[in-house]
Amino acid sequence: MQPLSILVLHGPNLNLLGKREPGVYGSTTLAEINSLLAEAALKLQAKVFPLQSNHEGVLVDAIHEALGKHQGILINAGAYTHTSVALRDAIAAVNLPTVEVHLSNIYRREDFRHHSYIAPVVIGQISGFGVQSYLLGLQGLVAHLKG
């Protein structure tokens, strides 16, 4: 059986994980998160393909290119969660099962972070568990895909 192919998208400023506001986002780097996801994916008979970009259009293009290439998407859109209709529309357009994750609990933060444009078009959202948000999101996505 072929492993499931999961696109993992990391949005703006996530390249600074480990340095940026460790009290909010923790001390784990993006490279470490990607490594943990790759390990977890192997155990779940899946493979992850991570991409980080600070540019909305790059993320939209990656979502479009996922069609026919990946079975699902795991996304931490960062600040674009609260601002990007383009990401929301791209996810809706490709209609691939997608899980939204956040390291911090976006509902315990500033009011403007309480709204997600992405949440209505994904199968689930996990926030507030630090690095575990990614791992739980991956588990949930794979379980959904395996039906």
From Swiss-Prot:
Pfam families: DHquinase_II. GO terms for biological process: amino acid biosynthetic process; aromatic amino acid family biosynthetic process; chorismate biosynthetic process; quinate catabolic process. GO terms for molecular function: 3-dehydroquinate dehydratase activity. The keyword Lipid biosynthesis does not apply. InterPro entries: DHquinase_II, DHquinase_II_CS, DHquinase_II_sf. Substrate binds at N76, H82, D89, L103, S104, R113. PROSITE patterns: DEHYDROQUINASE_II (PS01029). Keywords: Amino-acid biosynthesis, Aromatic amino acid biosynthesis, Lyase. The keyword Amino-acid biosynthesis applies. It catalyses: 3-dehydroquinate = 3-dehydroshikimate + H2O. Pathway: Metabolic intermediate biosynthesis; chorismate biosynthesis; chorismate from D-erythrose 4-phosphate and phosphoenolpyruvate: step 3/7. The active site is at Y25 (proton acceptor), H102 (proton donor). It comes from the Bacteria. Its EC number is 4.2.1.10. SUPFAM superfamilies: Type II 3-dehydroquinate dehydratase. The record marks R20 as: Transition state stabilizer. Homododecamer. Belongs to the type-II 3-dehydroquinase family. Catalyzes a trans-dehydration via an enolate intermediate. This is 3-dehydroquinate dehydratase. It comes from Nostoc sp. (strain PCC 7120 / SAG 25.82 / UTEX 2576). The gene is aroQ.
